[in-house]
UniProtKB/Swiss-Prot annotation:
GO biological process, one term: adaptive immune response
UniProt-recorded name of the protein: H-2 class II histocompatibility antigen, I-A beta chain
Glycosylation sites: 46
Membrane topology: Single-pass type I membrane protein
Residues in the Extracellular compartment per record: 32-225
Transmembrane segments: 226-248
Region (Beta-2): 122-215
Organism (species): Mus musculus (Mouse)
Encoding gene per record: H2-Eb1
Length: 264
């Protein structure tokens, strides 16, 4: 399903319903504000094969009236919207205009946005990490973070030693970033054992092949050995760099000296 952004019908209409006397207004502005606005929505299924148009009316953030193209007339959501629903349903020209909006508004705008929204693809960024840094054989939660992708249809699966995990999976669902991209967290509840390999696999329309990111369960001693190895490697690089610096500095100093005993 493709969804167009909700568009205010004209603008938010601010109604000031309380009139204060001039002396009071000079002292303190305590007038209440009331907000009435409407939203137009277009819902598309399989492109423009099936289109649904909604016109929703709100008063103080509460919906009270709507027109649904699937219904073909106005329906009151609360008692406040009932008089308007009865009034507009009695006017054929208003109903004809709203029913035609499926074509004049929704399909028309779909053609405008089609070149931008439908072909647009943004590849996801995938990272895997545990929520707790504790010894193995303890309950832990592995997180597969999938971020900054478009469109929103995405499939995330967990594997342990090459076998797909079907239970213990929790997801945040699709989260909108507000910049035409999405993110989601898919977590696996497990008790990691030494030597196990956990894999998060992501499939998305922007990818020609699934993306896989691995997390290997290691004992504390193995982690310490790995950190020691990395630390030794970095320390070796530092000493090598210092040695090369001293060597080239000495070479430069010697080349600047004139040999003694030669006639000039």
């Amino acid at each position: 399903m493709v969804w167009l952004p909700r568009v205010p019908c004209v603008a938010a209409v601010i109604l000031l319903l309380t009139v204060l006397s001039p002396p009071v207004a000079l002292v303190r502005d305590s007038r209440p504000w009331f907000l009435e606005y409407c939203k137009s929505e277009c819902h598309f299924y399989n492109g423009t094969q099936r289109v649904r148009f909604l016109k929703r009316y709100f008063y103080n953030l509460e919906e009270n009236l709507r027109f649904d193209s699937d219904v073909g007339e106005f329906r009151a959501v609360t008692e406040l919207g009932r008089p308007d629903a009865e009034n507009w349903n009695s006017q054929p020209e208003i109903l004809d205009e709203k029913r035609a909006a499926v074509d004049t508004y929704c399909r028309h705008n779909y053609e405008i946005f089609d070149n931008f929204l439908v072909p647009r693809r943004v590849e996801p960024t995938v990272t895997v990490y545990p929520t707790k840094t504790q010894p193995l054989e303890h309950h832990n939660l592995l997180v597969c973070s999938v971020s900054d992708f478009y469109p929103g249809n995405i499939e995330v699966r967990w594997f342990r030693n090459g076998k797909e995990e079907k239970t213990g999976i929790v997801s945040t669902g699709l989260v909108r970033n507000g910049d035409w991209t999405f993110q989601t967290l898919v977590m696996l509840e497990t008790v990691p054992q030494s030597g196990e390999v956990y894999t998060c696999q992501v499939e998305h329309p922007s990818l020609t092949d699934p993306v896989t990111v691995e997390w290997k369960a290691q004992s504390t001693s193995a982690q310490n050995k790995m950190l020691s190895g990395v630390g030794g490697f970095v320390l070796g690089l530092l000493f090598l760099r210092a040695g090369l610096f001293i060597y080239f500095r000495n070479q430069k100093g010697q080349s600047g000296l004139q040999p003694t005993g030669l006639l000039s």
